[in-house]
């Protein structure tokens, strides 16, 4: 029992550390899985023959042309940007070369992230990557296209689009589909209500992509839209665009965890000090130290005898009127 009592503070501190670094560890694991998904995607694309590659790309462009003819964009896609799984078989088959729903990936240098892009915006998709909003253009470039990509913000398990609000006009992001990479430069940042989908409309002749996340942080009553227009792509532009791992602990986890750990450490140190003080007192008594002879092992004075009782006892022994007989 005593051993358990000594180990308990250490276990609690370790538990607090795990809670403290849970967001960072979880984000690291998700980013590692995202990196694997990107590498697997690139390998699958490389395995395509030229004929297969062209067939997949042509089908995506044909889909976009049909959307443009139907004036797509003014839809309820933005309002259903969360928990919306696609049931359209044609849509789900496009750009889906591995059958896992991944159509490509996006790299945002400002956020230091490279994330897979999946069909639809179901909760399962948004927990691990970026979702493409159905009824918006597929992100394969071209005139009169407007793709919309949605990502979660503020998840305790992953960053994703948590820092999308840091994007400024002029920032760039890159979308890789099959063997092609498309560069976009931010030109418009707006905040709208979930039902306001006008900002997603296709604009004739323009090649646009809008990144979407919830706002304000942890309130999520509105949508933050970061729009970019197509610019020429040069490979060296993406040199600083690789994702990096860094410690990122939200304050709502950091401050309480640090306070708890500090209290537990202080309590453990006090317990150790008290234990040593008692052991020191016991050692002095056992060694016959005259300075500690009257000190109990726990540091307290021993109980003193009652002087009244002592005197009464002495009087009874002598007895009243009795004298000591001379030798």
What is each stretch, according to the model?
Residues 240-291:
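C-terminal single-pass membrane-anchor helix
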Residues 1-2, 322:
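C-terminal accessory segment of soluble enzyme catalytic cores
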Residues 2-250:
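Solvent-exposed, non-transmembrane regions of membrane-associated and secreted proteins
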Residues 276-327:
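Cytoplasmic C-terminal tails of single-pass
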